[in-house]
Amino acid sequence: MDEYEAQLVAVEQALENTTDEQQREELSTLRTNLQELLALTRETEADQTAEQGDILDDELLRLKSELNELEEAAANVGATKNKDEEQQLKDLRAKYNALVGEKCSAPHEHSWGALSYHNALICGVDDEVIINRNSELDVRLRVLYINPTHCEMLPCNYYLEGECRFDEIRCRYSHGALVPGASIKSYIPPDFPRLARNCPVLAKMPDRLWHRGRVLCANFVEQTCRVRLDGQDHKERERDFQFEELFPLITEEEDGLTSEDSSSSPHDESSDEIDSDMDDLEAAHRSRMVELSLFTFKPTEKLGAWEQYTRGIGSKLMEKMGYIHGTGLGSEGRGIVTPVSAQILPQGRSLDACMELREAANGDQDYFSVERKLKRAQRRQNKANEKAYARETQRTDVFSFLNGSVLGGGESRHQGDQAAKKAKTNDLQQHSTKTLNVETVRVADDIRRKQRDIAKVKQSLDRNATDIQLQKRLHMQLQSQKQELATLQAHEHRLSKEQHTRKNKMFEF
């Protein structure tokens, strides 16, 4: 249509500029045709626009009707679902409200992450709605623990009387723990007939906390027990308690026996469920710690490497407390892996000066380390000892010369005969490995000592080449020293051969 309008404008301009009558008639005819064509085109476009508008209106109306139908269906489904959820919540609240005042076994998560079940009293139902692990609606119950073992479990006396001035967060004691209703278990009553020697129990102390202990003796006539408490002072370790101040604990072995004898008992079922939950939690925690150890930085120095000189009681205690080798310290295994090194800073220097010294040493973090200083001092001391020993061995006086030259031959021969006789008579197979190691070290020292004596005799021969008599004695002494050295070397060879036969062999397939 734009092209037609442009052609019409061009034709009109040509009419204004043309004077020829024939051309003007042709242009007038062309202008008339273009005007008719434009009029027809406008009418056609108007009709098409009206039809398209009608189609869009119809589609819009259809879409609105479908949306209304979907909204009505969703509203109906939501109303039905809301009614079902409201009915479910109503039934749950009615069920839990009926349990208010009843005793149960409720979970408690300690500050270090461990989960344990304790007997508790249900004192209320919380208004908040939660979703449990099975993606189901649930409510929380407010419980007070009957046998609190830690301060955060101890009920507040003022709260029970309705006079506590602090809220639940600021109060040192418990205003009731909130636990999911689906996690509570059956109440475990105390089994007093189980009170016997070495029976583990919880005993109520004057601080209202229940401490672990073991029964020493039980008097069922007077309903009293003498209990040895764990972790108490020596004077207060053994105490007498009434039966109502004790709660017998069930060990894993006894729990397994009772579950075999009466598997249908609700008491045993609840204890089995508690133990299975605890086993699952411990297994999950251990697997998480092992997985964490695989991604932990492996230092060059092993944690506890100093215990190679001891019996390793520290590592054994840490392993008993649950430490896994390769992980960091702490209950989550995210603590330090390498031990903290002691640092000794220069006396009378500021921290800035110490930092400058460390930067001058290329930022060495162990520049002030105590271990490095001790190792450096040990190396200096070893070098000084070696130099002092070398000076002592090289220094000779008149008495040492006379002892070595005049009396050394007979004594050395006598010692050599004794060493050879001992090497022949000893049955090496009857000695232990430790004895063989000690004997190997002693023989090696004797060989080194004998080699030094031979070197001294050779020096004396070179120094006294003109004295014939002294030369004879020195040759005899040198021959004797060489025989003793050969005997010691043969004995060392037999020792090494015996030690080699006792080593574990590795077979290659």
From Swiss-Prot:
Disordered: where is this region?
Answer: 253-277, 409-430
- Tell me the disulfide pairings in this chain: none
Q: Which cellular component terms (GO) are annotated to the entry? A: nucleus
Compartment(s) of residence: Nucleus
InterPro entries xref list: G_patch_dom, Znf_CCCH
Q: Which GO-annotated molecular functions does the record name?
A: DNA-binding transcription repressor activity, RNA polymerase II-specific; RNA polymerase II cis-regulatory region sequence-specific DNA binding; zinc ion binding
Q: Where are the zinc fingers (C3H1-type)?
A: 155-178
List compositional bias (Basic and acidic residues) regions by residue number: 411-420
Q: Which PROSITE patterns match?
A: G_PATCH, ZF_C3H1
* Residue ranges of domain G-patch in the record: 310-356
Keywords linked to the UniProt accession = DNA-binding, Metal-binding, Nucleus, Repressor, Transcription, Transcription regulation, Zinc, Zinc-finger
Q: Which domain of life is it from?
A: Eukaryota
Entry keyword annotation includes Nucleotidyltransferase: no
Q: Where are the transmembrane segments?
A: none
Free-text function comment from the UniProt entry: Transcription repressor.
The protein's name in its UniProt record: Zinc finger CCCH-type with G patch domain-containing protein
